[in-house]
Amino acid sequence: MNAYVQQNQPPGVPPLELTGERTLPDVPTENYWYRRHLAVYEWIAARAAGARVLDMACGEGYGSAVLARSAAQVIGVDGNPEAHEHARLKYTRPGLSFEWGAVETYGEPGSFDVVVFLQTIEHVTDPSAVLRHFRSLLAPGGVTYVSTPNVLTLAPPGAAKSDNPWHLREYRAEEFTALCESAFAHVQMLGLFHAGKLRAHEIALRLGWDRLHAGLRITKPFYGWFTPAISTRDFTLRAAPLTHALDFVALCA
């Protein structure tokens, strides 16, 4: 069994393989990153009841499916044909559809109440233009949600970015805020942080847990249990301070 390929997919749905470009559900070793992304989707879904939602760069489609639990209509858009086909086959419910397209050009002006663009702004060559395009897609009173990793917690100390080859640029809080404000009149910035088991794990590491489990030779079995047990309850969103946030989530209007 390939540890980097999705397990137990529905009949007729081709599994996707991890490439580092996007996270996936149903890959036990990837569960931390999947839940970290999913936590933000769930938070947005709770605020999108009855809305017309556009989920840009939806990838595997799991986030679009979460949004569709509360929204009136969700369209998930991705430019990767393999991911698009997987999402279209796997996630079927009334009000949910998937389209193949480019985030820079998809959509008609004023067509959506909510635009979602998570963990992708760091991948695009002209982020300001993309955000201006999203602004044009919003109906009056609409909101765009954009998230990106915090370079200060993702990259090595002092580095301009992490070693993720898919990331063209990574942002500090003030840089990401300025980027969003270049396209939107109103921007509220939140940070995603560890909570629950992950917060306890952070504290344990500061007390030397990494040396202890290495010395006891239980690293592999411990994380073989711990990583699959992580849930979205092990993350929380709050406004400040943002220096140590895992990810930034911008609410733009």
Residue ranges and their predicted role:
Residues M1-G110, V114-L118, S128-L131, W166, ...:
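Conserved N-terminal segment of class I S-adenosyl-L-methionine
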Residues A200-I230:
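C-terminal helical/coil "lid" or tail adjacent to the Rossmann-like core of SAM-dependent
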Residues L67, F134, C180:
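Class I S-adenosylmethionine-dependent transferase superfamily signal
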Residues L168-A183:
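Short alpha-helix
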Residues S128-V143:
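A short glycine-rich, Lys/Arg-flanked "PGG" loop and its adjoining helix->strand segment in the class I
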Residues A185-G196:
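Conserved S-adenosyl-L-methionine
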